[in-house]
């Protein structure tokens, strides 16, 4: 009646889905592209949200100002200690609102991440009020 999901669950987990596709676990690599958000820069508010403490989930290799490629390479080295057999990664644009920039800048950053040979996809953390139709159309065009 239910599909045979690998973890013995009756739903499809994110990790299980990728494990079936790639034959292994995928690891997210946190990328800090130097974004801010409208609740920090004064457009909506100042100081940010109480739940958005990036220092709590910001690994040492993820530093704004470093290239995306350098952050990916250093992230792979960092995670290889624990996950030696992982060969495929997701570039996770995590800090603040990662669509809070003009589309040409987003295309540049996301394309740099997607061009890395070990990166099979991107994950984008953002606010819904920082995404417009133009950005969604471009993201939908990615294969």
Region spans (language model):
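Core AdoMet radical
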Residues: 56-75, 79-103, 118-131
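Sterically constrained small-residue positions within well-ordered secondary structures
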Residues: 20-22, 84, 115
